[in-house]
Amino acid sequence: MNMLVTMLINTTLSFVLILIAFWLPQLNIYTEKANPYECGFDPMSSARLPFSMKFFLVAITFLLFDLEIALLLPMPWAMQTQDIKTMTLTAFILLSVLALGLAYEWTQKGLEWTE
């Protein structure tokens, strides 16, 4: 009986919220609210906008460094192991690769936005 009452309340509340969601937006329609927002671009214009290659390279570099940092996330669980030297060596190698990659990008001016 208790489960039936709970399901009835949940179903009723869901239907009431759905009806409110469909009824409420029709009260005040503005032209600005009706237009979709596309990150500052006009959605009716051409989709072939010029794309900054520098932005693309910085975005790819960010993704690569983000994936390398994700390799370090299991380290707290690895600290529970009996072989602490292997875990420390692995963490040091991962951080070294990350630091070397950052130094390489810095020397090649891959992180500079303006040239």
UniProtKB/Swiss-Prot annotation:
Subcellular location: Mitochondrion inner membrane
Matching Pfam families: Oxidored_q4 (PF00507)
GO annotation (BP), single: mitochondrial electron transport, NADH to ubiquinone
EC numbers on record: 7.1.1.2
GO cellular component: mitochondrial inner membrane; NADH dehydrogenase complex
Keywords assigned by UniProt, alphabetized: Electron transport, Membrane, Mitochondrion, Mitochondrion inner membrane, NAD, Respiratory chain, Translocase, Transmembrane, Transmembrane helix, Transport, Ubiquinone
Reaction(s) this enzyme catalyzes, per UniProt: a ubiquinone + NADH + 5 H(+)(in) = a ubiquinol + NAD(+) + 4 H(+)(out)
Membrane topology classification: Multi-pass membrane protein
InterPro entries registered for this protein in UniProt: NADH_UbQ/plastoQ_OxRdtase_su3, NDAH_ubi_oxred_su3_sf
Keyword Electron transport assigned: yes
UniProt keyword Mitochondrion present: yes
Top-level division of the source organism's lineage: Eukaryota
Enzyme class: translocase
Transmembrane domains' residue ranges: 4-24, 55-75, 86-106
Gene Ontology molecular function: NADH dehydrogenase (ubiquinone) activity
Oligomeric form and interacting partners: Core subunit of respiratory chain NADH dehydrogenase (Complex I) which is composed of 45 different subunits. Interacts with TMEM186. Interacts with TMEM242.
Free-text function comment from the UniProt entry: Core subunit of the mitochondrial membrane respiratory chain NADH dehydrogenase (Complex I) which catalyzes electron transfer from NADH through the respiratory chain, using ubiquinone as an electron acceptor. Essential for the catalytic activity of complex I.
Membership in a protein family: Belongs to the complex I subunit 3 family.
Cross-referenced PANTHER family: NADH-UBIQUINONE OXIDOREDUCTASE CHAIN 3
Record protein name field: NADH-ubiquinone oxidoreductase chain 3
Natural source organism: Nelsonia neotomodon
Gene designation: MT-ND3
